[in-house]
Amino acid sequence: MSLIQKIIGRFLPRQRVIARFNAASRSPESLRNFQGSDFLSADAAMSRSIRKLIASRARNEFVNNSYANGIVTTLADDTVGRGPRLQIEGGEETEAYSRREKRFHKWAKAVKLNELLRCARIAKALDGETFIRLQLNPNAPREVKLEPRIYEAEYVESSTLAETPLEYYDSGEPVEIDGIFYDQYGNPTQYRFWRLHPGSPLGGATTAFTMDDARNVIHYGNFYRAGQHRGISEMAPALNIFNDLRRYSTAVVLSAEVAARLSFIISNDLPAEMMEGTVEVDENGQIAKTALDIRGPISLSSGDFNGLVLPAGYKTSQMKAEQPTQQYCSFKDAKIAEAARVFSMPFNVAAGNSSAYNYASGRLDHQVYHKKLLIERDEIATVILDRIYEAWQAFDAAKHLEDYPSTDESHYWMWDGFEHVDPVKEANAQALRLANGVTTLAEECAREGRDYQTILRQRAREIQDCEEKGLPPMPWMNVQQPVVLPEKED
């Protein structure tokens, strides 16, 4: 640009650039698309009636839609697996730790802890939340009488009909949110439980309830908004998708049934003027005379052959079954993938079909799903398992004080590992990590859900047995460089 153009350009009117957010448009189309948007708080948006309505629809979809049932059940099975195993770390008192771990494992099997965790995971997906009460069972034939018991969300409700909190502290925290009482700092203090489920035959006729201290109640739910106190169903965004899937499947089946029930269709290609005035009707409304032979078809039979004789100008044809079979499969797969995205579940797991997958694509899809499972396992360990272990430990220490020599200890929960789609690649990577010293045997075993101490003890027994029986040592017993097997291309 020349100097003269720059000088002249200063005196010319400048063109304004108009920019805006399309999402903030107030056009009729945008208002229709976002007609459900509001500024409600988390508790107001997730009121009791809203939560119960969504939960009831999610449960209905779960028991009537095989894909919804399979997705949620698979999610719970993959999350819990065979159940978490307690691992205690601390000083040198390994034998004492081992005895405690065995007692807890035995107690967990007796109270069906794994079943409780799977039920809790399903409840979070369908209902949005669940409650676990740490109560005692004096009649239980075991040393520790503690027995956690799970309750549906409807058990914890307010005695009033108010949908939103009526009282607040000066700090802004609510006094009660639908059966959960809080202090001025937002900590739950008490839970109000109905004696009977509100949906049971006598639940609506009773007003009996119990107040449980917060120390004895575990609240596990789906929380994603600031200030949210009650959980909302994880399936809420996918309910319409599952419903569309059922409706479309039903429509395709009905279309096929209609086509199968119609044996033939009779039609004619006569001009309209030939059909006018060709029928005379008597005083009783009965056909008296016809100019054209439009009587019904006459059936003929000759031996094993059957046929029809049609009136003049008429023809017959079979109804073509034109159900969208190819479109149905594509539509179904798209809906399943869309619904499973709520749980970060890959399509092949949700649909139970990996025909379109190879090792590379399967591994990439599963990485996201496995991260989701790891995050959920960590939440279960923090919210549920640590609380249960703390309560169990109080009873166990009273009877086995000798197994609690040190207070400087910690614990973690070991879960089932994830199987690799290519075992050779994973074994090579594991061997290189161990050889380079960037990992430990404990970490590698933890990835597979195994205890490295159990493996070392088994190795010691195998070495001793080989020496006693005069057998040559196994390949892994010889000190050598790690063997890396050749990898195959995908």
Predicted feature residues:
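N-terminal-proximal low-complexity accessory segments that begin disordered
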Residues: 1-86
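Glycine-centered helix-boundary capping/hinge motifs
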Residues: 112, 342-344, 449, 470
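Charge-rich, acidic-biased intrinsically disordered regions
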Residues: 131-153, 271-296, 387-418, 478-490
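Extended, charged amphipathic alpha-helical segments
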Residues: 217-364, 483-484
